[in-house]
């Protein structure tokens, strides 16, 4: 993050604009809207500045720039067509520790001004960090079309209710659930837009007096295979509404950065053969947090119902009467194969695909004879440590040694690495890779050279 987004309280505070043209006028409108006590300095002014001065809205200082104009200022803007003058204003402000914006010169400025969507008191600011103002403007226009004009009225009304809501609901969780109900209530929003006081009062009383469900809930969310762009929209909504997020090591930092900032985060870092927190304890964490009335998200890499032990966790919740739901995710097999240019099925090479755990525990022998058959694709999850055994067993049961194989490490991430070869090389290839990795075996791997789009980017 190159810039910290902040909202400045400028009401009745001295601000300076140097420049008297059209660009300076646009900046002046923003400062006047914010209630600043504005002084504008220039050699000449367009008529709008004169009109504002005549109305007593700002002060004009005609003539060359004088650094003393900054002495009482909180904030300054250099908006002339003279680069040297703009630089001088910026340096003078910097020496006084005053924030200064230099129009069209972000590197010379100590702050930049975003594109603004104004639904006062709700404000949305969009910035490209000064690199692409046109892109920021296009995004602002798109957001303008998505945010109803009456949104500001809803926000203002919520401010009026805050005291009563704080008295009515004892805990932060109860208040948040109330506000969520209020903000998605279409009838209230329409009544505010129409200024229908009777309907506003009726709807508000109904929402406040409606009993809240004090039970917590758990949502099992699949985070996908790594790339944050592959997180589903519903998954994103759930992690941004969560009070607690319980996650493991397969969830990327990019996805965790999307979690609501004030949510509690509980790391239970699981990987093959090692559990930072035992599965039974994870089950109890979910149960314990939900019993406190919290909204809990269990965030798992890939899909929670494919080798994620999601079913075991939900059984514990079900037995305790805790409400739960599941948001599927893109499983590693689908994501890793797509980002490696390997179609899992193909008319000529594979009519089926098998997803297999590589945890070859004692007493859990796989059906190697069927796995060695042609016209299918095998995908081994967590199979890196057992690659030599997988190679030996498949060859023993008749799979040709020249069968194409690939191992995908950190699939779909920018650090993705893929190596391929033949089945006779699988054990050796696995020694070159690190976890998390996925093993893909089948004729479809031979299409990788032609279809490998991701690494070519």
Swiss-Prot record:
CDD domains: SUMT
Binding site for S-adenosyl-L-methionine: 225, 301-303, 306, 331-332, 382, 411
The keyword Methyltransferase is annotated on this UniProt entry: yes
Pathway assignment: Cofactor biosynthesis; adenosylcobalamin biosynthesis; precorrin-2 from uroporphyrinogen III: step 1/1; Cofactor biosynthesis; adenosylcobalamin biosynthesis; sirohydrochlorin from precorrin-2: step 1/1; Porphyrin-containing compound metabolism; siroheme biosynthesis; precorrin-2 from uroporphyrinogen III: step 1/1; Porphyrin-containing compound metabolism; siroheme biosynthesis; siroheme from sirohydrochlorin: step 1/1
Gene Ontology biological process: cobalamin biosynthetic process; methylation; siroheme biosynthetic process
Annotated keywords: Cobalamin biosynthesis, Lyase, Methyltransferase, Multifunctional enzyme, NAD, Oxidoreductase, Phosphoprotein, Porphyrin biosynthesis, S-adenosyl-L-methionine, Transferase
Location of the active site: 248 (proton acceptor), 270 (proton donor)
Reaction it catalyzes: uroporphyrinogen III + 2 S-adenosyl-L-methionine = precorrin-2 + 2 S-adenosyl-L-homocysteine + H(+); precorrin-2 + NAD(+) = sirohydrochlorin + NADH + 2 H(+); siroheme + 2 H(+) = sirohydrochlorin + Fe(2+)
Region ranges (Precorrin-2 dehydrogenase /sirohydrochlorin ferrochelatase): 1-204
EC annotation from Swiss-Prot or TrEMBL: 2.1.1.107, 1.3.1.76, 4.99.1.4
Gene Ontology MF terms: NAD binding; precorrin-2 dehydrogenase activity; sirohydrochlorin ferrochelatase activity; uroporphyrin-III C-methyltransferase activity
Region (Uroporphyrinogen-III C-methyltransferase): 216-457
Domain of life: Bacteria
Location of Phosphoserine modifications: 128
Pfam families: CysG_dimeriser, NAD_binding_7, Sirohm_synth_M, TP_methylase
Keyword Lipid biosynthesis annotated: no
Residues noted as binding NAD(+) in the record, renumbered to the chain: 22-23, 43-44
PANTHER family: SIROHEME SYNTHASE, SIROHEME SYNTHASE-RELATED
Biological function: Then it catalyzes the NAD-dependent ring dehydrogenation of precorrin-2 to yield sirohydrochlorin. Finally, it catalyzes the ferrochelation of sirohydrochlorin to yield siroheme.
Protein family (similarity comment): In the N-terminal section; belongs to the precorrin-2 dehydrogenase / sirohydrochlorin ferrochelatase family.
Record-given protein name: Siroheme synthase
